Every structure is written in structure tokens, then in C-alpha cells.
Amino acid sequence: MGIDSSLPNLLDLVGLKVATISKIEPVASELPWLFSDLMKFVNQSKYQRVDNKGKVVLVETMRVGLNFFGIENLIIVLTSLAFKRSLPQITEPYPMIKLRIWEDALAVAISCKQIASLVGVNQNHAFCLGMIQAMGKVVVSKLYFRLFETVLREALVETQDSQKHEEHAALTRITPSGPFLNHLIDKYALGVSARLIDKMAMKRVFIANAMFEVANNKPAADISPLALVLKQGKAYAQYRILKRYKLIDVEQSKAFIRTLGMPAGALELLKATDIRSLDLRMIND
């Protein structure tokens, strides 16, 4: 339903200053999906390297894949791959839900990382929190579609067995409600994310308290620096997404930006940042 149970230990290990690929590889291998997903990621055309004969050099081992971007970037890579793997697959009649959740999570994570770089907050923790804060949306969405399917199936069987033909026909036309799902996400998602992160019980990736502060909607003046980064990253990502889909006009944009209380230089940095795709070349710059 949520994050892979082996991920917290792996992220904690990667967070150690003395971490090495030889120590990380056995733990990484406990995630059965990681090898194939990591190979697809590092062998993307934008990351491909060529030898002196111009032939593309493919990455084919877990060890090389884990070390491809450096240990310092592994938390970002692993968190992104794990989150993407968790996205809901069956969301008919709303096939774009999976894309929208990923789009939001990535935009928030990248925005948080960039803001963190300006205020002395750990950038890896900021990215990790910015992405995993969206796990509540994943869990709520999966539960909603699963429960809808279960209840509808039971109702169809009941009306068929009792020969209630009109009711049965009406039930076949019922589909999940997008507005109701949005209501459930607005009401429960952040709290679910906070409890999920707390259950992960990570000892070196310190993001649980900040998530609870944001989920409990504490005032900006009373929260930790990481929680403030998350609030600002979420707000800025929301602004950029609304602007992309032309759901906010220029004057609304200016007014909204003024409410964010962003640190000096943040808006300029974020304006120049691509928050739509994870590009490790940006991270390595």
C-alpha cells in the first residue's frame, strides 16, 4: 500500500557519513524491484556515456548503478524510485491520477531541495520529505479505488441474486467520484503521510517531526526550519503547477507569491529550476 518496508533501513544506511557502496549493495538487493528500476533510470539517454569509440556504455550491475551519481545523491535516487513504484495503477475512469501525484511529489521535492540550499537545511532530507509527504495521496487513492470496487462488486452480486434488474443496471453505470476522492485527499492525506513516515522510524533521515508539524498545520512561526521548507516548497510547487495549467492569472500569481515568505534569493533560484523532471545533472552542478 505504501513505501517498501526495506526502504527505511536503506535510506538510514545511505545517510551515514561512512557509508560505502559495498555496505549499501546487500541492503539495496533486499528490494526486489530496485535492480530493474535502477538500471532503467541510469541508462536513460540523458545520462548515457560513451567510450572512446563512441559506443554507448550500459550500466549492468547494481554496484555501478548505485555509484552512478555518487553516494551523496543516493537518497534522492532511491526515494524517487521507491515513490514512483508505489503509485496507484488502477484508477479508472481517472487514468491521469498517477501522473498528477507524481508531478506534484516531484515538484515539491525539487522545490524543497532548492529552498533548503539557501537556509542551511539538509538538502537530501528536504527532498526526501518533499516527496514522501505525497505518500498519503497514494494511500488514500489506492484505498478509495479498492473499496469502491469491493462495495460495487458486492452490490452487483446482491442485486443480481435478488433479481433487482433496474438497480443492477443502475449500479453498472456508477463510477468513482473524482470530487469525493479530492475531498478525502484534502482531509486525510497529510495525516496519513505523517503516520507513515513515523512508522518508517528512520534514525538518520530526520523528517518525521517536520511532517507532523505540517500535517497539524502549525503556524510558520512555531515550526522547525525543515517544516518551513516543506510548507514553502509545497506552496511554490502548487503555484507553478497552477500556472502551468493556466488555472491562476498574473495578479493572483503575484498575490500568492507574496504570501509565501520565501527566503532571499529563493524565487530567482526556483524560477530557473526545472521542477518537472528529476535531472541528476542539476544535482551534480
Q: Where on the chain are the PLM-derived regions?
A:
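Conserved alpha-helical "signature site"
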Residues: 1-131, 137-155, 174-254, 275-285
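Low-complexity, flexible helical/coil segments
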Residues: 113-117, 163-168, 243-246, 265-269
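A structural motif
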Residues: 156-172
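Short, flexible helical or helix-coil boundary motifs
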Residues: 159, 237-240, 260, 264
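Extended hydrophobic/Leu-rich segments
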Residues: 167-171, 242, 257, 270, ...
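Hydrophobic alpha-helical transmembrane segments of membrane transport and translocation systems
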Residues: 252-254, 263-271
